[in-house]
Amino acid sequence: MAEKEHYVRTKPHVNIGTIGHVDHGKTTLTAAITTVLAEKGLAKAEDYSQIDAAPEEKERGITINTAHVEYETEKRHYAHMDAPGHADYIKNMITGAAQMDGAILVVAATDGPMPQTREHILLARQVGVNYIVVFLNKCDLVDDPELIDLVEMEVRDLLTEYDYPGDDIPVVRGSALKALEGDKEAQEQILKLMDTVDEYIPTPERQTDKPFLMPVEDVFTITGRGTVASGRIDRGTVKVGDEVEIVGLVDKVLKSVVTGLEMFHKTLDSGEAGDNVGVLLRGIDRDQVVRGQVLAAPGSIQTHNKFKAQVYVLKKEEGGRHTPFFSDYRPQFYFHTTDITGEIELPEGTEMVMPGDNTEFTVTLIKPAAIEKGTKFTIREGGRTVGAGQVTEILD
């Protein structure tokens, strides 16, 4: 049996993706980037059909087609997300299946910004993609350079409209198809694009550098030692002796100190993002901590009942609802590890939400949850997933 390739972490890692209107060349650009970098020995060339036949993934009960390619520049290691269909993009961005540190917005110079261009920019803004680099594609098909200048101005205005620094965002012009076909000048523009991405999109703060957060999945007692809360560490690190807070489902925040940590039945000095651990808590009774709460670094997260959310509602074919819903709809919101009933209030001018819609609304929970801007959730009804979303604004 062949040994698995070991991932060697020598360069900083950044997650990016291509966004933009259908047929503007997102997948062609993805293929062109890998092809051009492959010539420098920094990537494996992926052809269009490989990327376009994206495998299905399940993220929190929702099926999404996503292609992931990886490549390197001289400075960084990139994981690049590309989704074949428009609905896949929306689901990807809202469920956080592909958490992007930055995005390459692809706009065809032949068309200019189109409806999905706008929708993707809005979504990127809502889900916290703070850095966008623009690639004006198909420039070889436009004879008059002044027309390309006009398209660039339109794109900059559109970005400004959604609170991006439209005047300062870097714009690179080129032709992804020509680069794929081996045109030297077009390939130079692809390298210029990647240099721009290297420079403009900052290296993200690593998950381990963020404040500790662990959703509690299970609670048990070790006789003579105390109460253990177990779960997967979402972010940050925790070590024996750390002070933590138990937050969520009740208004009162409990404080405790970590007196022991174990993973796979072995004791541990410290745990970090991604680890499944049991955390022994000093002075906490078995019934004072429950599934659905979180353990967190003191002061790092609070409970809230009311928030605004950006949501994708599943279609009937995806196992979602068969009928629309209206304001006052009361499903369960599954946060971290538990369901909390909440009432939905649709924005003014929205009568109802149809299966398949991507929408924004306000939620009021019947119990407080440990949430913040960017917290992901699914919407469930009788145990089945009918939607997925994330918190875009806290309202209380």
Curated annotation (Swiss-Prot):
Its EC number is 3.6.5.3. GO terms for cellular component: cytosol. Pfam families: GTP_EFTU, GTP_EFTU_D2, GTP_EFTU_D3. Residues 175-177 are annotated as: G5. GTP hydrolase that promotes the GTP-dependent binding of aminoacyl-tRNA to the A-site of ribosomes during protein biosynthesis. Residues 11-205 form the tr-type G domain. Residues 137-140 are annotated as: G4. Belongs to the TRAFAC class translation factor GTPase superfamily. Classic translation factor GTPase family. EF-Tu/EF-1A subfamily. Coiled coil: none annotated. It is found in: Cytoplasm. CDD domains: EF_Tu (cd01884), EFTU_II (cd03697), EFTU_III (cd03707). GO terms for molecular function: GTP binding; GTPase activity; translation elongation factor activity. The keyword GTP-binding applies. Keywords: Cytoplasm, Elongation factor, GTP-binding, Hydrolase, Magnesium, Metal-binding, Nucleotide-binding, Protein biosynthesis. It is an enzyme of class 3 (hydrolase). This is Elongation factor Tu. Residues 61-65 are annotated as: G2. It catalyses: GTP + H2O = GDP + phosphate + H(+). GTP binds at residues 20-27, 82-86, 137-140. It comes from Lactobacillus helveticus (strain DPC 4571). Residues 20-27 are annotated as: G1. Monomer. Residues 82-85 are annotated as: G3. Its main location: cytoplasm. Mg(2+) binds at T27.
